[in-house]
Structures are given as C-alpha cells and as structure tokens.
Amino acid sequence: AINENYLQDERASAEDYTGNLLLVKDIVTRYLRGGVMPYDAAHDAFAVSGLEERVAYSFPFRAGERELEMKFGGIADRIDTLDDGALRVVDYKTGAPHLEFDGVESLFTGTGKQRLSNILQTLLYSMILHHTRGCDAEPALYYVRSMNRPDYSPQLDDKQLGVRGARYTLYRERFEELLRAQLAEMYDPAVPFRQCEDADTCKFCDFRIICKRG
C-alpha cells in the first residue's frame, strides 16, 4: 500500500522507507492491530466489499425555474456488505470521536462548529450508495485511536431522535429536502454571498482564499 499510494513505486523495498514515512507506517500498523482488526473480529456480521472506492451520484434539485443537478462524489474508505444485504460505508478518522448530532437539521442550520462535517460526509456517501446501488446504507465512523475501548461504537448517535446506528432511509426524505433547499439557495442570484460568522471555522477550509478569508 505504501509503495502504490505514497512512493508510487511498486518495486520499492523497506530500505526505501525513511524518517517520517517509517513513523507513519508504525502508527498506522498500531492502529490496525490494536483497534480496527480486533474490533472487526468481534463484530463480524459483515463482509468487506470495497476499499478506497470512488462513488458518485448526480443529485437533482430545482433553483427557481431551472432543473439542475449537483454531482456528489468522493472516495469511500471502505464499503461493507452486512448480513441482511444492506451496505455500511466506513470512514476512518484519527481525531477524537464525534458521533453525536442533534438531527439532520443541525447539519445544515447550525453554526460552523455545530455542522459536523464528518457526519455530513458519511450521510452523503450513504445517499450516493442508496441511489446508485438500490439498497439501504449505514454510515459508520471508525475513530481508530478509540477503537480499543470496550464501549466503542462507530455508529452515529442521533440525540434528537434518540437513535443510534440509524440507516439512511430513516433520514432520506428530510435529508434530501434540506440538501435541495441548501443547493437552491446557493444557486439563487438574489441571495448574496455571506462569509461564515465564525472565523475559526475557516482556518482549515479549502475555499478560504476565494471568500477572502485566506
């Protein structure tokens, strides 16, 4: 994996691994052996069906009198097939766990800090799989530094509904309604561009230069 994705040289040997690369390799190996693999072995009602898989879906919406589409896509870290035929989309994270949210509305209407991009991302991936593969999908976040805790769960925890581990179809109607409304506003020429109120949110935003916060 290191040869293919980092060095881009399948003929490289261990002698070519130096400095920071060796450190990262050791950290990743420790996360896998100490967290991901033991967790998966203890929760084995699934089969891995895809790794680093490109997914995409053209989402239809209406802006004024125009019928438009927005293409959502990305690379899903891992896709599992669960025993009942549903899919699970897994996103690996290295930070502190953030699995709780106050319903899908909070992902669209909260402040920058309340808009949990990790949860929104996995729900978008679940939406893509639902529409392109015709089955339900369960979003999951693997926070690898915390997976050795006995109480760890990668399932999203919806505090508004009091539900943990809900699949996409539970949210589909409301999630897509909010997504369409957000896109319609973005494409409405009558709505002026507004910078995020919380400037701290912009520190790691890829678009901060465009909106003059860079």
Task: Identify what each model region corresponds to.
Residues 44-47, 85, 135-137:
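Residue-level signal for beta-strand positions within conserved beta-sheet cores that form or flank
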Residues 50-132:
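Non-catalytic protein-protein interaction segments used by genome-maintenance enzymes to assemble
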Residues 4-15, 94-107, 145-163:
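Short acidic (Asp/Glu) and glycine-rich catalytic loops that position anionic groups and cofactors
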Residues 6, 114-119, 124-214:
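Metal-dependent nuclease catalytic regions and adjoining charged, substrate-binding loops involved
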Residues 40-42, 70, 196:
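A general structural signal for stabilizing positions within well-ordered secondary structure
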Residues 1-2, 20, 24-28, 68-72, ...:
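Secondary-structure capping and boundary motifs in well-ordered enzyme cores
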Residues 1-60:
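A non-catalytic, helix-rich entry segment at domain boundaries
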